[in-house]
Amino acid sequence: MRDTILGRASAGAALALLVSGASVAHAATPRELGFNVHQSATVGLDATRDAGAGWVRIDLNWFDAQPRSAAAYDWTRFDALIDGALARKLRVLAVVGYTPGWASEADRKGGGNENDVPKAGTYGPFVTAVVERYKAKVTHFELWNEPNLEQFFEGAPRDYIDRVFVPGADAVHAACPACKVVGPGLASIGSEYGDWLDQVLGAAKGKLDIVSGHIYAGFPAPGSGNGVTSDSFFQKLERHRVVELGGVKVFEGSLSFKEVMDKHGVTAPFWLTETGREATAGDAAQEEAQRVYYRQVLEVMLTRPWWTGTIFYEAFDEPPAPYTWGVVVHDPAAPGGYRAKRALAFLKKVTSSQPAFGGAKTDCDDGLDNDLDGRVDFPADTECASAAAASEGVAPPPGTGNNGGPPPGRDAGPPEPPEEVDAGGAPPAAEATADAGGCAVAGAGGRIGEVGALGVAGALTLAFRRRLRRR
């Protein structure tokens, strides 16, 4: 089997970087870092501040703010949440979405009104009201969340474009020309997210200031390329997966976020507004796997100037349900009101040290493997003369080596089935708890079509586990 990854950068450009010996610069590109925080948010805001992150992503739910009619507003919970963020010197990315009953065109598939396509002419005026109220405090507005998942939006791409994105973007820019439109916030699950992004950019790319998406896939082990038996973070980010057997294509995944952006000539920055990994507090292996996943996300981000913001999912394990995506656990008896997982201390180290995040140290003392050679900081990385040295060495250009490069060719045996599993939610395998990998999923045998369908179902189940609670 050969797993061919379609690259966006030319081999000549990559070779030029290697020959020049230039490292992939990241300090010159400031990066934004934050957490998703839900409405019962005090602990989440505190954890975000304590991690040294500068942003929170909140849900400004339409059905809460305008529950009864177009004429009645209730801003109470959002005023408190936004003011709480500002009091902690945090910036806010507000997700404006979810349909109230009075604005629903129809409940096409059952399950309530919140994921319904809104009636024409209803969403834009609400976005105008949001921006007018908060533009002195909030400058970034994301238009809906994961509209390609039925849980959050029942419509087709054209419904999203016509009823949500275009009227919403026009409303933001009209009410606040300096404010930023972020979107479409697609989940990288299944085979259609690339098509969704293709349609949105084809119809309205000029209205987007920041392209956003969500990736929960894991990272392949060093030396294995960007994934052979399952989809990887790299394939969803920038280089989609094609599986060939004997020179015959047997599977092709969705185009990645960056490939679709390049197809449309989009030069707006990319923000990953959800990514993360579950970890049960007190389980050392899971906490370490979560820490490693966070580390890998930031290392990859710092080698890609076009990717300028990451919002992790999420700040804290919100009671009473057993959600474990957070980096802290609510505990009123603990100092600060929470108990921290390992990822929090790691983020404190990175944000206080790495210049791209406003830190005051260097690559050799920032907690990251900046040159992607498997060694972190002085003295482990022998290319660092001291902890104060400026550079760990040269990172492979994107799409090469351990930075998402093609995997070694394999010709023997049948192809492994493609997996579309939300790897961030899978329990860690024992061998995947060290720095070699961020998350692991077990591969299953079977025909490609059958397993692909099962994989999508599993991915949706895991996505719903993240989000089946009041946001």
Residue ranges with predicted function:
Residues S10-G21, G455-T461:
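Bacterial N-terminal signal peptides
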Residues A27-N61:
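Boundary/entry segment of secreted carbohydrate-active catalytic domains
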Residues A47, A51-D195, G218-A221:
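Substrate-binding cleft and catalytic face of glycoside hydrolase catalytic domains
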Residues G124, R158-E288, G337:
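Noncatalytic carbohydrate-binding groove/subsite architecture in carbohydrate-active enzymes
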Residues R133, P147, G282, A289-Q296, ...:
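Aromatic-rich peripheral "rim/lid" segments of glycoside hydrolase catalytic domains that contact
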Residues A356-G405, G409:
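Extracellular calcium-associated, cysteine-rich motifs in secreted modular proteins
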Residues V394-A442:
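C-terminal low-complexity, Ser/Thr- and acidic/Pro-rich disordered "stalk" regions positioned immediately N-terminal
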Residues G449-R469:
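A cross-kingdom C-terminal cell-surface attachment/processing module
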